[in-house]
């Protein structure tokens, strides 16, 4: 059915809570015009202050480059983190990308929205889990059964 939702729960972002997964799915189901919901965090470095590294030179990343503008005057931006993402089945079925055209944001918890790519990332995740008493089925506060 067109209402079917596909959830992406990447193993490189392990610190999700069941209620967060349900919330993201419900967000998409309740927003009929949305194609997907992406988990995002606020971006620390604004893309309008960024450059592409091209051999020995820097190339402005955007056409409206603002490297010297005060950050607080720039529009807020976010980055996709792959913590919990949801997309309507029809978007995938019809050969679109994995998000479609109308993408709704879900602000992921920055302290748990890790991306485990390197050994250092894994060590950081293990340290967090040990520090907070997290384990399989026990994410969040140590007293939380989830």
Q: What annotation goes with each model-predicted range?
A:
Residues 1, 29-32, 133, 137:
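Secondary-structure transition/hinge residues
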């Amino acid at each position: 059915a067109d209402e079917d939702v596909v959830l992406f729960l990447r193993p490189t972002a392990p610190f999700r809570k069941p209620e967060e997964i349900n919330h993201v799915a419900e967000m998409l189901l309740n927003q009929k015009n949305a194609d997907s919901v992406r988990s995002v965090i606020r971006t620390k470095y604004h893309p309008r202050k960024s450059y592409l590294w091209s051999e020995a030179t820097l190339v402005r990343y955007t056409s409206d480059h603002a490297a010297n503008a005060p950050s607080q005057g720039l529009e807020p931006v976010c980055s996709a983190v792959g913590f919990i993402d949801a997309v309507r089945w029809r978007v995938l079925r019809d050969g679109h990308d994995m998000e479609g055209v109308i993408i709704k944001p879900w602000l992921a918890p920055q302290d748990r929205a890790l991306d485990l790519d390197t050994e250092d990332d894994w060590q950081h995740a293990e340290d967090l889990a040990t520090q907070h008493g997290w384990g399989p089925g026990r994410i969040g506060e140590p007293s939380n059964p989830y």
